[in-house]
Amino acid sequence: MMHCLVGSEMCIRDRLHSLVGLAAMLVGYANFLSHATEYIGIEKTIHDIETYLGILIGALTFSGSVVAYLKLSGKWGGKPLLLPARHWLNLGLLILAIYFGFAFVTEAAIGGGVEPLIFMTIIALLFGIHMVAAIGGADMPVVVSMLNSYSGWAAAALGFMLSNDLLIVIGALVGSSGAILSYIMCRAMNRNFISVIAGGFGTGTSSSGPAIEVEGAVSYTHLRAHETVHH
């Protein structure tokens, strides 16, 4: 009961978009370090993949949610942070995450692979910050919807890791509904859905063609108030 009261008070005071990502990250680490159930063979590989994905998505969602909160509350400027070669930076972070994931999954020792997991967590946190920081304030509704989808997928990965069917179902529902809503919002705002997922679509491209000149004479017609009344 005390935990519920403390959690409710935190939800009222803190206006972060979601703490699901932080919960997924912490539970993933706790489950990995507890060694409550030791898997071998293909079961260990599958469980390690589930753990890795849960922590990866959770860390990305949490750091992105913090930046989104700062932007929406006015504590972070609404102007997008456009770093040079930011798309190559995102690609590099993705490649590093895949590399550390391979190193983590192929670790033969039970409980091994802590270093790749920590490095991946740092990369995911940085990627979440960079992804949301590169988005302008006008596009934040799409970002919030996408982060909501990410939190659902993080919960689903947690459900697979913990063999919890309820978490899997709820996470899949939240993730899929958030993704569909984000797609609809992108269509309405004339945004590219893939660009939203990848991050860094902060500014739209504007037309650079010549200005249109209006030619011809302009005529004016003056009307009196009583002339506009029809009997």
Predicted regions mapped to residue ranges:
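C-terminal ends of transmembrane helices
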Residues: S8-E9, S65-P80, F127-G137, S182
